[in-house]
From Swiss-Prot:
Plays an essential role in the initiation and regulation of chromosomal replication. ATP-DnaA binds to the origin of replication (oriC) to initiate formation of the DNA replication initiation complex once per cell cycle. Binds the DnaA box (a 9 base pair repeat at the origin) and separates the double-stranded (ds)DNA. Forms a right-handed helical filament on oriC DNA; dsDNA binds to the exterior of the filament while single-stranded (ss)DNA is stabiized in the filament's interior. This is Chromosomal replication initiator protein DnaA. ATP binds at G154, G156, K157, T158. It comes from Streptococcus equi subsp. zooepidemicus (strain H70). HAMAP family: DnaA_bact. Belongs to the DnaA family. Transmembrane segments: none annotated. Residues 84-109 are annotated as: Domain II. Its main location: cytoplasm. The gene is dnaA.
Length: 450
């Protein structure tokens, strides 16, 4: 691409993005490519079904960019995957170059190259999902098919989808891979219906080696006739040919209430794994990894403070670091203290769910009352079985129900260090998963505290 062609195309994209909603831009413009500008004609490669949208909505954009760069009216010649090779054969060196064609893969995977297994932080809450994803990437279509990953927003489902795709692509650069949200699958279905080009949609999705569908619950929300039918047929075509399918959702297959039963049944053919919010240790590990992207010093107490402020998902942690970076750059600060971090994230905390301020003393009192021990005994060093349990439950609840840092909590329990609090928290958390009676006890205490 010449310098003028690059300037022209960048201007087209800039103008399009300023005029379209982000979702519309991503769907209709993101995958388009400029091949060349010759004799005042811009040759643009895109999906055939999107040509009508470009003609109707982006003609003025191309005209504007053309006059700005070439001082001429630029016409457009749209080419598609199936006719690009034909044009090249007819035009030889005067037409499209081999290099240009190679830059246009048979399938636009839409994978994000920054996501890999290497930079995904593992913890107890996502260990099985990671293991299953790696197994699928190593032997697609044979191990778990489909793989269904569910969990709340911001927990790493999209990261794992892309990591699977990038891993497969690394081993087999010719693999036909497609990452797409269920919402965009629906959008493509609608466009193909309107253009009467459903055969193209079938060709595109039913000949894949790996299909990665994000937020499949969006498919359940749609009542458009034929959408679920088309996905059902796509699923069957791929599965029958031992092609790997990976799906993510914010709920289990059984809770996709508006989805046809036959789809739900197929989603459960393979393996279903859950990702839950990261525990404190994992949040610390995530932050320790993320701060390497910033040119600031983060002392350990600051990292632990931040890990204690956001416990619902990874996006909150990433957003907090961006807030801190903004404040630190403005103040020209190199070392991020707890006070600086607290100032930087104040607005984010105010925008988020409000946490009722609960004194640790109140937690200790309610736990002691429930287990028949005194607050003094909870804070002391005595290690009889009933006191140790009460002490660890109180530490667990102090971590769960307040935004105090681990060192602060330890100080309220007789001056214990943060590692003792962390050990107690993890121990009780693990016990809750195995002991239903303990879980009920802790819920009872929490209700009394609230």
């Amino acid at each position: 691409m010449t310098e003028n062609e690059q300037i022209f195309w960048n201007r087209v994209l800039e103008l399009a993005q300023s005029q379209l909603k982000q979702a519309t831009y991503e769907f209709f413009v993101h995958d388009a490519r400029l091949i060349k500008v010759d004799n005042h004609v811009a040759t643009i490669f895109l999906d055939q079904m999107k040509e009508l949208f470009w003609e109707k909505n982006l003609k003025d954009v191309i005209l504007t960019a053309g006059f700005e760069v070439y001082n001429a009216q630029i016409a457009v010649d749209y080419v598609y995957e199936d006719n690009l090779m034909i044009e090249q054969q007819h035009q030889g060196q005067q037409g499209y170059t081999e290099q240009a064609f190679q830059q246009l893969p048979a399938v636009q995977s839409d994978l994000n190259p920054k996501y890999s297994f290497d930079n995904f932080i593992q913890g107890d809450e996502n260990r099985w999902a990671v293991a299953a994803s790696i197994a699928v990437a190593n032997t697609p279509g044979t191990t778990y098919n489909p793989l269904f990953i569910w969990g709340g927003p911001g927990l790493g489902k999209t990261h794992l989808l892309n990591a699977i795709g990038n891993s497969v692509l690394l081993e087999n650069p010719n693999a036909r891979i497609k990452y797409i949200t269920a919402e965009n699958f629906i959008n493509e279905f609608v466009v193909h219906i309107r253009l009467d080009t459903m055969d193209e949609l079938k060709e595109k999705f039913r000949n894949l080696d790996l299909l990665l569908i994000d937020d499949i619950q969006s498919l359940a929300k749609k009542t458009l006739s034929g959408t679920q039918e088309e996905f059902f047929n796509t699923f069957n075509a791929l599965h029958n040919n031992n092609k790997q399918i990976v799906l993510t959702s914010d709920r289990t297959p059984d809770h996709l209430n508006d989805l046809e039963d036959r789809l739900v049944t197929r989603f459960k053919w393979g393996l279903t794994v859950n990702i839950t919010p990261p525990d404190f240790e994992t949040r610390v590990a995530i932050l320790t990894n993320k701060i390497q992207e910033y040119n600031f010093v983060f002392p350990q107490d600051t990292i632990e403070y931040l890990a204690g402020q956001f416990d619902s998902n990874v996006r909150d942690l990433e957003g907090a670091l961006k807030d801190i970076s903004l404040v630190a750059n403005f103040k020209q600060i190199d070392t991020i203290t707890v006070d600086i971090a607290a100032e930087a994230i104040r607005a984010r905390k105010q925008d988020g769910p409000k946490m009722t301020v609960i004194p640790i003393e109140e937690i200790q009192a309610q736990v002691g009352k429930f287990y028949g021990v005194t607050v003094k005994e909870i804070k002391a060093t005595k290690r009889t079985q009933d006191i140790v349990l009460a002490r660890q439950v109180a530490m667990f609840l102090a971590r769960e129900m307040t935004d105090n840092s681990l060192p602060k909590i330890g100080k309220e329990f007789g001056g214990r260090d943060h590692s003792t609090v962390l050990h107690a928290y993890n121990k009780i958390k693990n016990m809750i998963g195995q002991d239903e009676s303990l879980r009920i006890e802790i819920e009872t205490i929490k209700n009394k505290i609230k």
